[in-house]
C-alpha cells in the first residue's frame, strides 16, 4: 500500500481542533482502519487473484470469473472508504487554519490595544486588573494555538460530521451489496465463455470473512460516534443557552424591572413619561441599583428636571423622619400619599403599605412633594417665602399652603412655604402666579436684602366631575421663597424645589 504519512499528518491537525468525541473517531480511524489495513489486511488479499482457481481449461474463463466474483478488491475498496470519509475532515481543517490565522491577527490587535490601555495613567485599579486578566487570557490562547469552536467554524464542523456520516453509510451499503457479510469458499461462475456453470475456489475465505466483519464493525462504530458527536454539540449548545437564560434571569431578579436605575452626573435631565400605569425604576446616586415599583395614573404628562448634580429619587408613603430628609443633599424626594382608588401609589421595597383614603371617589386629588437641593453653590441669604394658608373648612380651595423646614449649609433651619393642589369647585379660576408675585413683593420690601430662587410649581390634579386642563406646552415658571420659621409636622402633599426649574408638558 501507499504511504499514509501525509494523510496522517493532516488528520493530526484536525485532532487538535475537534471535540472529545471527534478525537475518539480519529483515533479509531488511525488505529483500527489505517493501521490494520496497512499491516494485516494487505497480506491476506495479496494472493487474491493468483490463488483464485476454476475447474475449467477454457482460456480466459478464470479472468472473467474473478472479475465477476470481485468487482473491486476489498483492500482498494477500504482504501477508498478511508479517503472519502476523511475528506470532509480535511475541508474542515482548511477552514480551521484560515480562522486560526484570522484569530491570531485579531488577537494581536487586541493585545496592542490592551497594552495601550495599560499605559494610560488615568486608568483606575479595577480597570487595570481587568486589562491584565485579558492580556493573560490572550497569552494562554496563543499557547493553546486553537480556535474557539463557535460561529461559522462550528457550522462547518457540524456539516463535515454530517457529510462523513452519509459517506460512511454509503460505503457500508456498497460493501454489503458487493460482498455481503461472508466470503464463500466456492463461487459459481456462469459467465461466457465458460461452459455452463464453473466452480471457482477462493483462497483464505474464513480469514477474509473475519476482516470483512471487522471492517463492518469499525464502520458502524464510526457512524455511531458521528451521531454521538452531533448530539454532544447540540446538548452543549442547549446547556449554554439555558445557562445564559438562567444568568440573565438572575441578573434581572437582582436589578429588578426592565427600566434599571441610572446615575446622572453633569448637566443631565430626569424625565418621567407615562400614559398608562407602568413599572419604572427610580434613580439613585450612590452607585447602587434600587428599583421601586411605581403605578403612574392614566395621564399624558411629562416633567423634566434639569440639575447639575446627581439626582436620587426616594419614595415613602407615610410620615418619615424629616431629619434624615434634611441631611441628604442633591436628592430629589418624591412623596405621594396612598390613595384609595386609581391614584398614584409609590411604595418602597420593605416599606409598610399605607391605607389612607382621602376625598370622595368622584373627586380624587393627587399631590406630590419634591425636594431638590444642591450640595454646592447654596445661597447663604435667607429665602423669600410665598405662602398661603387654608382654613379648616373643607370648602373649595384649590391652593393650600404647606410649610416645612429645611436645614441650610450653616445649620440654621429654613422654612419654605409651598402650594399644593386640591380639588375645588371654583378656586382654580384664581391665578396663583399673581398672588405669588404680590406676596413676593411684600416679602421683598420687608427683608430688603433677601435673595429669591426661581423655581416652578407643578400642579397635577385629577377629577371626574370638573377636570381642569393641563398647563401649556411652554410650561409655567414661578418663584418660590422661604423664611426662617419652624413647623411641627412635615407636609403631607407639597412640592418644594430649590435652585432648579420644573417644566410641565
UniProtKB/Swiss-Prot annotation:
This is Gap junction alpha-10 protein. The chain crosses the membrane at residues 17-37, 77-97, 166-186, 210-230. Low levels were detected in skin, heart, kidney, testis, ovary, intestine. Expression not detected in brain, sciatic nerve or liver. According to PubMed:15147297 expression is detected only in horizontal cells in the inner nuclear layer of the retina and not in other neurons of the central nervous system or tissues. Detected in the outer plexiform layer of the retina (at protein level). It is found in: Cell membrane; Cell junction, Gap junction. Belongs to the connexin family. Alpha-type (group II) subfamily. One of its GO terms (cellular component) is gap junction. It comes from Mus musculus. Its main location: membrane. InterPro entries: Connexin, Connexin_CCC, Connexin_CS, Connexin_N, Connexin_N_sf. Residues 1-16, 98-165, 231-505 are cytoplasmic. The keyword Transmembrane applies. Disruption phenotype: Mice are fertile and show no obvious anatomical or behavioral abnormalities. In horizontal cells of the retina tracer coupling is abolished but the spatial tuning of ganglion cells is unchanged. PANTHER family: CONNEXIN, GAP JUNCTION ALPHA-10 PROTEIN. Residues 38-76, 187-209 are extracellular. PROSITE patterns: CONNEXINS_1, CONNEXINS_2. The gene is Gja10.
Amino acid at each position: 500500500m501507499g504511504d499514509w504519512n501525509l494523510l496522517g499528518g493532516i488528520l493530526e491537525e484536525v485532532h487538535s481542533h475537534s471535540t472529545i468525541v471527534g478525537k475518539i473517531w480519529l483515533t479509531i480511524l488511525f488505529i483500527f482502519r489505517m493501521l490494520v489495513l496497512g499491516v494485516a489486511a494487505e497480506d491476506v488479499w495479496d494472493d487474491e487473484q493468483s490463488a483464485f482457481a476454476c475447474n475449467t481449461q477454457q482460456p480466459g474463463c478464470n479472468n472473467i470469473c474473478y472479475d465477476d466474483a470481485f468487482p473491486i478488491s476489498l483492500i482498494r475498496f477500504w482504501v477508498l472508504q478511508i479517503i472519502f470519509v476523511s475528506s470532509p475532515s480535511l475541508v474542515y481543517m482548511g477552514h480551521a487554519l484560515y480562522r486560526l490565522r484570522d484569530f491570531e491577527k485579531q488577537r494581536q490587535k487586541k493585545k496592542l490595544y490592551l497594552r495601550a490601555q495599560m499605559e494610560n495613567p488615568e486608568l483606575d485599579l479595577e480597570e487595570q486588573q481587568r486589562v491584565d486578566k485579558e492580556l493573560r487570557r490572550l497569552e494562554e490562547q496563543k499557547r493553546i494555538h486553537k480556535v474557539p469552536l463557535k460561529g461559522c467554524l462550528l457550522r462547518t464542523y457540524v456539516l463535515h460530521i454530517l457529510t462523513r456520516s452519509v459517506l460512511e453509510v454509503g460505503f457500508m451499503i456498497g460493501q454489503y451489496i458487493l460482498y455481503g457479510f461472508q466470503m464463500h469458499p466456492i463461487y459459481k461462475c456462469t459467465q461466457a465463455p465458460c461452459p455452463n456453470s464453473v466452480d471457482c475456489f477462493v483462497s483464505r475465505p474464513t480469514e477474509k470473512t473475519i476482516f470483512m466483519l471487522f471492517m463492518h464493525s469499525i464502520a458502524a462504530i464510526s457512524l455511531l460516534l458521528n451521531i454521538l458527536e452531533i448530539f454532544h454539540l447540540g446538548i452543549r449548545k442547549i446547556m449554554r443557552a439555558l445557562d445564559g437564560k438562567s444568568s440573565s434571569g438572575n441578573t434581572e431578579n437582582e436589578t429588578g424591572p426592565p427600566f434599571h436605575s441610572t446615575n446622572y452626573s453633569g448637566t443631565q435631565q430626569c424625565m418621567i413619561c407615562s400614559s398608562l400605569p407602568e413599572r419604572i425604576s427610580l434613580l439613585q446616586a450612590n452607585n447602587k441599583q434600587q428599583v421601586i415599583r411605581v403605578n403612574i395614573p392614566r395621564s399624558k404628562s411629562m416633567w423634566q428636571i434639569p440639575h447639575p448634580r446627581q439626582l436620587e429619587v426616594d419614595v415613602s408613603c407615610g410620615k418619615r423622619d424629616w431629619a434624615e430628609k434634611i441631611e441628604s443633599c442633591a436628592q430629589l424626594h418624591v412623596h405621594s400619599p396612598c390613595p384609595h382608588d386609581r391614584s398614584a401609589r409609590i411604595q418602597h421595597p420593605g416599606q409598610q403599605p399605607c391605607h389612607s383614603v382621602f376625598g370622595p371617589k368622584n373627586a380624587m386629588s393627587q399631590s406630590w412633594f419634591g425636594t431638590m437641593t444642591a450640595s454646592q453653590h447654596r445661597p447663604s441669604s435667607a429665602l423669600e417665602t410665598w405662602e398661603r394658608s387654608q382654613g379648616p373648612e373643607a370648602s373649595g380651595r384649590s391652593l393650600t399652603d404647606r410649610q416645612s423646614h429645611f436645614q441650610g449649609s450653616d445649620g440654621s433651619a429654613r422654612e419654605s412655604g409651598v402650594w399644593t393642589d386640591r380639588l375645588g369647585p371654583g378656586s382654580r379660576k384664581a391665578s396663583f402666579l399673581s398672588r405669588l408675585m404680590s406676596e413676593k413683593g411684600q416679602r421683598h420690601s420687608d427683608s430688603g436684602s433677601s435673595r429669591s430662587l426661581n423655581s416652578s410649581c407643578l400642579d397635577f390634579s385629577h377629577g371626574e366631575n370638573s377636570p381642569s386642563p393641563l398647563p401649556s406646552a411652554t410650561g409655567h415658571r414661578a418663584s418660590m421663597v422661604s423664611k426662617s420659621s419652624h413647623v411641627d409636622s412635615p407636609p403631607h402633599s407639597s412640592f418644594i424645589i430649590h435652585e432648579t426649574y420644573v417644566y410641565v408638558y
